[in-house]
Amino acid sequence: MSSQIIPVEPFDYVVFGGTGDLAERKLLPALYHRQMEGQFTEPTRIIGASRASLSHDEYRRFASDALKEHLKSGEFNEAEVEKFTSRLYYVSVDAKSEQGWDDLKKLLEEGKDRTRAFYLAVGPAIFSDISEKIRDHKLITRNTRIVVEKPIGRDLASATELNDTIGKVFREEQIFRIDHYLGKETVQNLMALRFANALYEPLWNSAHIDHVQITVSEAVGLENRAGYYDKAGALRDMVQNHILQLLCFVAMEAPTSMDAEAVRDEKLKVLRALKPITASNVEQVTVRGQYRAGASSGGPVKGYLEELEGGVSNTETFVAIKAEISNWRWAGVPFYLRTGKRMAGRMSEIVITFKQIPHSIFDQSAGRISANQLMIRLQPNEGVKQSLMIKDPGPGGMRLRNVPLDMSFAEAFAVRNADAYERLLLDVIRNNQTLFVRRDEVEAAWQWIDPILKAWEATGQQVQGYTAGTWGPSQSIALIERDGRTWNDAI
């Protein structure tokens, strides 16, 4: 927890897309919280950059309004907001022309000895333009980093091209490919659980684990992202990045240290060990779904096609996959992955189910003995839960009950749980890449995803309908139940 209050050296953060949705909802509130925790030192500055024509004061009012809308109750402090907005500046720039770049250079010259970070909170179509403008206007110092948001391509070829483009301007050690899921406290606690406790690691293998489930479900629909989402789909949007990164943290071998390269080397080995899914088995191990009209958050909602202009699409809003890792530790242990929109609730969790005891010494009257589970909850309510079998209290003989040992971070620690972006934004300034994705990881993930996309196309695998507000199509239930297992659906 000490990292929350260790100040960082003064820096300049330039946010391209500084008036966009990500900046408004996530980046500005995250930076505000870090100031409130006392981590900023003077003369730290945050510089918004976009095509909109705004003055410094107009941008400060924009930021104040954004904080008022997106901070939780009690977090908006007038004095603190005024202090925060006083360090905000704005430059109107155009990625496609010379407009504003000399103004940005002049502003940055005032802090030429500080750490400098460029955050590309914009679409990947202009990553190249912005990178080249940064280079051409000589804005790169020895302490410069660049932060890149997903999507990193839509297939291996485009990801490689995008990485090449950015790599012509910035060295790999300067590039921070952000996946906000990796900034969640629970993901880092997974490392602590595995490698700081003698209890779990000896059991963390195919001899003791029956299967692993990773679920990332959303209750929302398109939310004004129809143009992007219908070209991407759930596999590209969620599995290629968030879910495969979570899988890596579950399955990786112990790194030699917490050094960024050591951790990412082990994650890369997992990605390269994923068993290929091709046209020969894609229909047996994957399910594509698309939500229909139903109910969500207590009210009726439209189906995907009704939300979509044109009303015709075979894009999946849900995907379930039975993945396998071909290595010594995980051979024979299925990893069931699923993600989707308009599901029964917003939930991200990892469930490790251990194998059943080899022999029961108890009479049938004791009841069914359930397999032990370790549940790692990322959202909502980050925490860790371990299920155990114990004797039911009372004199009525030996009756067994499955009970949870439940640790909620919010209840266990008397501090505010920092948002993922708060941690990651300052890790960029600290030059700590442990929770960021390396180029070869991105490309290895696409090397596994691409054949699935091609297999769907080759086999003509269609999306299966599911009612909004449910856990997905019935075929996804069959995917796991034919192996004698069930999804963990509790929220």
From Swiss-Prot:
Location of the active site: H242
GO biological process: glucose metabolic process; pentose-phosphate shunt, oxidative branch
Domain of life: Bacteria
Pfam families per record: G6PD_C, G6PD_N
Binding site for NADP(+): R51, K150
Enzyme class: oxidoreductase
Alphabetized UniProt keyword annotations: Carbohydrate metabolism, Glucose metabolism, NADP, Oxidoreductase
Recorded metabolic or biological pathway in which this protein acts: Carbohydrate degradation; pentose phosphate pathway; D-ribulose 5-phosphate from D-glucose 6-phosphate (oxidative stage): step 1/3
UniProt: substrate binding residues: H180, K184, E218, D237, K341
Any one GO molecular function term: NADP binding
Documented EC number(s): 1.1.1.49
InterPro entries to which the protein is assigned, alphabetical: G6P_DH, G6P_DH_AS, G6P_DH_C, G6P_DH_NAD-bd, NAD(P)-bd_dom_sf
Similarity field: Belongs to the glucose-6-phosphate dehydrogenase family.
Function field: Catalyzes the oxidation of glucose 6-phosphate to 6-phosphogluconolactone.
Name of the protein in its database record: Glucose-6-phosphate 1-dehydrogenase
